[in-house]
Each structure stands twice: as C-alpha cells, then as structure tokens.
C-alpha cells in the first residue's frame, strides 16, 4: 500500500516515496514531505545540473552545491537555473 504525503513542492497530497532515498536528517525531511512526482522532477533537474555544469560527485564542493540546489528546489519553491540553457519550444 502506498503512502500519501502532503508534498511541500507540489502543495498537494500525493503518493510518497517508498523509502528514504537520501541520508541523514535531510533525507528524513524529504521522505516525510516530498512526493514521488516531485522527486522525479528533481532527478531530472539534478541530471541537467550535473551535465551542464560538469559537476564531479567525488568533489565535496560540487556535492554541496547540488544539495543546496535540491533544498531550494524541493522546499523553497525555486526552480533550477542553468546559464545558457534554453528549454525546447513546443
């Protein structure tokens, strides 16, 4: 049976994550307050950030930058801005 959470990002009740995907207190906060849909949105943005900014996940500073962007996206309602990226037109 799936869990329902009030998603902080989407501002609605939605299906919650099946298990904690991120370590520590932040991981618990994500598990309790972020839906699968919002997490999938973040994963897409995260991939873009890593690729466009050429981030190295072995670099502590790059991981901190990604974590800051994640908190801003999931909890502060800020979108990820990548310099030079133009979304495809419909």
From Swiss-Prot:
Instruction: Kindly list the GO CC terms recorded for this protein.
Output: cytosol
Q: Which Pfam families match?
A: Iron_traffic
Does the keyword field hold Iron? yes
Indicate whether Transmembrane appears among the record's keywords: no
Ordered alphabetically, the record's keywords are: Iron
Q: Which GO terms describe its molecular function?
A: iron ion binding
Q: Which BP terms from GO are recorded? A: cellular response to oxidative stress
What function does this protein fulfil?
A: Could be a mediator in iron transactions between iron acquisition and iron-requiring processes, such as synthesis and/or repair of Fe-S clusters in biosynthetic enzymes.
Q: Which family does it belong to?
A: Belongs to the Fe(2+)-trafficking protein family.
User: HAMAP family, per this entry?
Assistant: Fe_traffic_YggX
Q: What is this protein called?
A: Probable Fe(2+)-trafficking protein
UniProt source species: Photobacterium profundum (strain SS9)
| Classification lineage | Bacteria, Pseudomonadati, Pseudomonadota, Gammaproteobacteria, Vibrionales
């Amino acid at each position: 049976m799936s869990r329902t959470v009030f998603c902080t990002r989407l501002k609605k009740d939605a299906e919650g994550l099946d298990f904690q995907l991120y370590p520590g207190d932040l991981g618990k906060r994500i598990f309790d307050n972020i839906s699968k849909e919002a997490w999938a949105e973040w994963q897409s943005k995260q991939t873009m950030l890593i690729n466009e900014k050429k981030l190295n996940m072995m670099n502590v500073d790059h991981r901190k930058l990604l974590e800051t962007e994640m908190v801003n996206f999931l909890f502060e309602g800020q979108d990820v801005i990548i310099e030079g990226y133009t979304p495809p037109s419909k």
